[in-house]
Amino acid sequence: MGRRASRETAMKLLYQLEIQKTDRDEQINMALEDESLTKNDREYIKGIVDGVYEKTPVLDGIIEKKATGWKINRLSKIDLSVLRIGIYEILYRDDIPFSVSVNEAVELAKKYSNEDAGAFVNGLLAKVSKGDLPQETSANEVDSQ
């Protein structure tokens, strides 16, 4: 399937979880049943979805801080899902270069949101750095993600 398509699947799943608020594990398992997914695809998707879910308070705090004049509840659920993935990758996935995380998030926003979403996502993610990690997060925790 490839990393781009896997990221897109993860974003759709996060969006679905944000909208439906039903059994998370059941929805993840259903999404991972897709026969076109490789073992690597499944691992990436599950890792992103679980990681974003676990770090949502941190990710949302960063969005609130960086999105000047915007509140989380005013963002579309698509934009929120895209931003959470982008920030999660930037902060917790050292195997994914910063520029790739930003570019992929921008492409998802352009594809699934409104015409201004790509620029909004790009501008916000450009402001994110490892310095945004909460103080209690150790370097070892970041490296193990």
UniProtKB/Swiss-Prot annotation:
What highest taxon heads this organism's lineage? Bacteria
Q: Where is the signal peptide?
A: none
Keyword set, alphabetical order:
RNA-binding, Transcription, Transcription antitermination, Transcription regulation
Which Gene Ontology molecular function entries are recorded, alphabetically?
Answer: RNA binding
- UniProt cross-references to Pfam families, sorted A to Z: NusB
- GO biological process, any: DNA-templated transcription termination
* Gene Ontology CC: cytosol
Q: Which NCBIfam families match?
A: nusB (TIGR01951)
For this chain, the family text in UniProt reads: Belongs to the NusB family.
Sum up the protein's function in the record's words.
Involved in transcription antitermination. Required for transcription of ribosomal RNA (rRNA) genes. Binds specifically to the boxA antiterminator sequence of the ribosomal RNA (rrn) operons.
- Supply the name of the protein: Transcription antitermination protein NusB
Biological source species: Ruminiclostridium cellulolyticum (strain ATCC 35319 / DSM 5812 / JCM 6584 / H10)
